[in-house]
């Protein structure tokens, strides 16, 4: 009987651990190749709306998130300029198996929904065939409700970082502003003060 109880406890424990593991992805430390000059990246920067369905590696995703909005200094400052030192945006990653919140400090992706939302990233459903969509979630309360222009500036800086990263690393990308915000808010279980400001589709070249 004792052996059976121990076995059941172990099985339950393993199941719990597996459940957590299945909903959490620990990304590797960012390690950008650094072979492309800024001049070349700027020359290649463009919008491309076709994507290979081939998945990005976890290192690719980690590098992409770091370039977009990562911490680049010991004082915690990031790769984008912001007003008053306030970071008003959070990053989510939409993959085929669901949407994940990027926990920046630990570089962890935490699943918030198992729904495949990629096709809902834009009105033309371009994201349906792409492996990944970055989702920028803004906080209306970041500047006491009076900082919409600051938030837009921050989102624009993130968007351009993504474009330059993709140009330098031979990925295709397109930023999208036309999508059903209410649908995203419901899927991500966002509080009333938060909303999706932009989505950006990223994928390998075809």
Tell me what each language-model feature is.
Residues 1-4:
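Positively charged n-region of N-terminal signal peptides that target proteins for export
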Residues 7-16:
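Bacterial N-terminal signal peptides
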Residues 20-130:
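N-terminal amphipathic, basic helical "cap/leader" segment at the start of enzyme domains
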Residues 31, 136-140, 204:
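Short, small-residue-rich loop/turn micro-motifs
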Residues 45, 64, 91, 132-186:
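Small-aliphatic-rich amphipathic alpha-helix that forms the alpha element of a beta-alpha
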Residues 100, 108, 143, 182, ...:
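Flexible, glycine-rich phosphate/dinucleotide-binding loops
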Residues 129-131, 193-194:
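Short coil/turn connectors at secondary-structure junctions
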Residues 190-206:
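A glycine-rich helix N-cap at a beta->alpha junction
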């Amino acid at each position: 009987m004792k052996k059976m109880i121990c076995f059941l406890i172990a099985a339950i424990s393993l199941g719990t651990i597996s459940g957590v593991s299945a909903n959490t992805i620990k990304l590797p430390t960012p390690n950008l190749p650094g072979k492309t000059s800024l001049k070349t990246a700027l020359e290649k920067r463009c919008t491309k709306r076709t994507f290979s369905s081939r998945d990005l590696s976890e290192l690719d995703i980690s590098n992409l998130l770091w370039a977009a909005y990562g911490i680049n200094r010991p004082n915690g400052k990031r790769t984008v300029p912001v007003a008053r030192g306030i970071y008003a945006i959070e990053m989510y990653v939409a993959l085929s198996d669901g949407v994940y919140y990027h926990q920046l400090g630990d570089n962890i992706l935490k699943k918030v929904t198992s729904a495949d939302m990629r096709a809902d990233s834009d009105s033309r459903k371009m994201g349906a065939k792409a492996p990944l969509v970055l989702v920028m979630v803004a906080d209306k309360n970041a500047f006491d409700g009076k900082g919409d222009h600051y938030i837009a500036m921050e989102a624009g800086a993130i968007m351009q970082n993504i474009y330059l990263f993709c140009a330098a690393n031979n990925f295709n990308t397109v930023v999208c502003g036309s999508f059903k915000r209410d649908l995203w808010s419901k899927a991500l279980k966002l509080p009333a003060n938060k909303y999706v400001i932009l989505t950006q589709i990223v994928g390998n070249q075809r």
